[in-house]
Design a protein with these regions (language model features):
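Non-heme Fe(II)/2-oxoglutarate
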Residues: 1-87
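Residue-level detector of solvent-exposed, low-hydrophobicity positions
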Residues: 14-20, 25, 49, 53-54, ...
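Catalytic core of non-heme Fe(II) oxygenases with the double-stranded beta-helix
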Residues: 89-158, 163, 170-172, 180-192
Length: 196
């Protein structure tokens, strides 16, 4: 048996307005309407997930039309957010869309193989549910107070859910997994002061 000591670290999530939202929303929704679709249906003793339209299986294909449209402003946006955390050089791992019709849900889950997960709320009906996250170690459930056009960034180990869609309108998100590869040099010089 192992001895395990657990110590608290502060974690975070960030919520920011995507400045290109108004210019891109209708174009991205149209491109997604024409995109490949692999509905997600997971049903076992743990999950009863159903996502009406999705291309998660194609997440590593960056040549899809909506991805090529979305990536340049997304990378600029993530570069700006990274500055707040002293991190630079975004490495995108996967990107995909999900569309939820009434009754669809994506149960509690996390993301592997990346440092961070992002959710861009492309089309969020007013009566559609908000993303919820579990606070590590306390198991407190937090409902994220976002609005359409926002981007949520969470560490990829954070357990989160998109609860059952109660709206009769389609909810559309673009999700992405990524890393920040480096530390800004100015920050690194500051951090080096703590080295012996």
């Amino acid at each position: 048996m192992i001895n395990l000591d657990i110590f608290r670290l502060q974690s975070f999530y960030s919520l920011s307005n995507f400045e290109s939202h108004d210019a891109l929303k209708e174009k991205l929704l149209h491109q997604i309407s024409l995109a490949d679709n692999v509905p997600m249906n997971w049903k076992d003793k743990y999950y009863d997930d159903n996502i009406h339209r999705c291309d998660w299986d194609l997440g590593e294909d960056f040549k899809r039309t909506f991805v090529k449209e979305f990536l340049p402003p997304l990378n600029d946006h993530l570069d700006e957010i990274g500055k707040a955390f002293s991190l630079s050089e975004v490495v995108l791992r996967q990107i995909w869309y999900q569309q939820y019709k009434i009754g669809d849900l994506h149960g509690w889950h996390n993301h592997a193989g990346c440092q961070f997960t992002g959710i861009y709320y492309l089309d969020q009906p007013k009566d559609a549910p908000k993303t919820q996250i579990i606070t590590p170690l306390s198991d407190e459930v937090i409902t994220i107070d976002f609005k359409e056009g926002d981007i949520l960034i969470i560490p990829s180990y954070i357990i989160h859910t998109s609860q059952k869609n109660t709206s009769d309108k389609i909810k559309t998100i673009i999700s992405f997994n990524f890393d920040w590869k480096n530390i800004f040099s100015d920050s690194l010089l500051k951090f080096n002061q703590h080295l012996n």
